[in-house]
From Swiss-Prot:
GO molecular function, a single term: rRNA binding
Keyword check for Transcription regulation: no
Known partners and oligomeric status: Part of the 30S ribosomal subunit. Contacts proteins S9 and S11.
Gene coding for it: rpsG
Organism of this sequence: Chromobacterium violaceum (strain ATCC 12472 / DSM 30191 / JCM 1249 / CCUG 213 / NBRC 12614 / NCIMB 9131 / NCTC 9757 / MK)
Keywords assigned: Ribonucleoprotein, Ribosomal protein, RNA-binding, rRNA-binding, tRNA-binding
Coiled coil: none
Record-linked HAMAP family: Ribosomal_uS7_B
Superkingdom assignment: Bacteria
GO biological process: translation
Name under which the protein is recorded: Small ribosomal subunit protein uS7
Keyword Cell membrane: no
PANTHER family given in the database record: RIBOSOMAL PROTEIN S7
Amino acid sequence: MPRRREVPKREILPDPKFGSQDLSKFMNVVMIDGKKSVAERIIYGALEQIEKKTGKNAIEVFNTALSNAKPVVEVKSRRVGGANYQVPVEVRPSRRMALAMRWLRDAARKRGEKSMDLRLAGELIDAAEGRGGAMKKRDEVHRMAEANKAFSHFRF
């Protein structure tokens, strides 16, 4: 907890092509070494691939994938009387979004397709349909929280 004032959240500019703030955030998550133009090319390429493969609106598929990958609960370590307990806690909305984006990116990087835009397109389509690496990660986190439900009275 900061001892001084609370730092205000920065206003995120929506992306130029679709006018979506979430897409702009995702661009920043995908970006490596400050190369935003490369991240932009990857994401727009992936969205084009999504429209080709599914025939649906790419932004809708992206938003569905994002909402499907968001975790509801996660576990945090809490030390009580010399023992560490994994305590399930609810994830706040901003962290939900950040985790979902990170998991989508990581799952896309682990896929086998040739280029990153194809990998990302495949992962977003899979996540929108409720499968894929990001969904596996979310389910794993939910399972951990479910298994440690007995320690939920140690809330922070």
